[in-house]
Amino acid sequence: MPLNHYQQEVGPSLADASPGKMPDVALLEGRYCSVEHLTVAEHYKDILDFYFTNQILSDWTYMYADPFESEEAVRQCLEDYEQSQNPYFFAIRAKASGKVLGTFSLMAITPKNRSVEMGRVILAPTLQKTRAATEAQYLLMKYVFEDLNYRRYEWKCDSLNRPSANAAMRLGFTYEGRFRNHAIYKGRSRDTDWFSIIESEWPALKKRFENWLAPENFDEKGQQRRSLRDY
């Protein structure tokens, strides 16, 4: 650990301390899905199905927002999402069906510290636990580390939201700890669990994703031959 002229330990100097970029992308193309900057004109009809018409009410338990009560409320929400720069919202289009089956965002975007959070994840049941869902996360991670030049990628969730925590760890996030009494929402107290991936971990994690997503990792029934954690 380096020392300053007072003989105090300090963090390592950075070869590049410039700020990261703000997200500004229309399309990230993958083998199983595309990740598209969310717009009302392109995505409202498909999103309406899993946000309202056939929404799963239990999916909103750990979200700060409540379930939508009308089509107009969904439209207004998506209009806000389209205009927002922080968070910056994306739609996930599954190539198998051609339909948008999920949304997520880059949020808590902090260019000065080159830190950003993955959040606001809402997936239709038909997208959950699929290659397309995993690839969408991979595509956005790649964009964050390789195009935006960020150092830290965060994931946070209610400490009681085990599916979210399990998803984070499967995707390669490291558990960092728990912020107790971190928030109040829906009249409840929330402890928040924090996870992260840092830039030095990305090259190895990228290889894991690419190996797992390769067509030869899946049999004729679409079942994985090796899990993501096995790579």
Language-model segments: which ranges?
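Glycine-rich acyl-CoA binding loop
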Residues: 133
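GNAT-family acyltransferases
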Residues: 1-130, 143, 188-193, 197-231
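Conserved catalytic-core motifs of GNAT/GCN5-like acyltransferases
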Residues: 174-188
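Conserved GNAT acetyl-CoA-binding A-motif
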Residues: 146-156
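Conserved beta-strand-loop-alpha-helix junction that forms the acyl-donor binding cleft
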Residues: 155-164
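Conserved active-site tyrosine of GNAT-family acetyltransferases
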Residues: 167-168, 195
